[in-house]
From Swiss-Prot:
Keyword Ribonucleoprotein: yes
Biased composition (Acidic residues): 1-22, 33-43
Name of the protein this chain belongs to: Small ribosomal subunit protein uS2
UniProt feature, compositional bias: Low complexity: 23-32
Annotated InterPro entries: Ribosomal_uS2, Ribosomal_uS2_arc, Ribosomal_uS2_CS, Ribosomal_uS2_euk/arc, Ribosomal_uS2_flav_dom_sf
Entry's Gene Ontology BP terms: ribosomal small subunit assembly; translation
Record GO terms (molecular function): structural constituent of ribosome
High-level lineage: Archaea, Methanobacteriati, Methanobacteriota, Stenosarchaea group, Halobacteria
GO cellular component, one term: cytosolic small ribosomal subunit
Source organism per UniProt: Halobacterium salinarum (strain ATCC 700922 / JCM 11081 / NRC-1)
Amino acid sequence: MSENESDTEAELEENAPDEAAADAESTAQTDEQTPDTEADEPAPESTATEDVMSDEEADLLIPVEDYLGAGVHIGTQQKTNDMDRFIHRVRTDGLYVLDVSRTDDRVRTAADFLANYDPEQILVTSSRQYGRFPAEKFAEAVGARARTGRFIPGTLTNPDYDGYIEPDVLVVTDPIGDSQAVKEAITVGIPVIAMCDSNNQTGNVDLVVPTNNKGRRALSVVYWLLANETLDRRGAEPTYGLDDFEDGL
């Protein structure tokens, strides 16, 4: 899949895999990058005035105030060239603001994509503490599989490992924290959907969902929307509310 620079709804990120990794991956894991204690979430600017999207007429899945209240738009103080097109502006405190209309659009696109897969062949991962419960709830809602916490090397690449699985698509909470899962997905040739913040590299990601991927409320909202939209495209009635994705946090 390759990215269409016209930024149409169906655009996908170009998958540029590295060389195939050996089955015996390094045991150095992302726990060092994603400590159990997550950073405090920055305080949003006034939700009545904050400019968070380029398309002010966009028909969003939820009110823009709900995105703001969850901090979905709050990026980091760093940005990559890969994520530049998803950034709307920079705040006075130096934080980059993600374009909420692009987030909303990419949730829909990801749901369209996932609805084509057997639910049990979808794997979602999260090494980040605040992403674990929402990721597990997403898997429960759509019938997917979840591997949260430390991703064991060989899960996708070593048939001799007891926990070996063969999913058809991978959803990750953070390409940095979930780098082992992404690396193995590239090795076995399955597409990767990733929640990406302003500081993420996306060269190994097939479909970016731009969002604050460090805040617990932001991840709850995005995973909840993705679950509901995926179910909707299958013709199933969503039965989970946002509270269900936040109860375990």
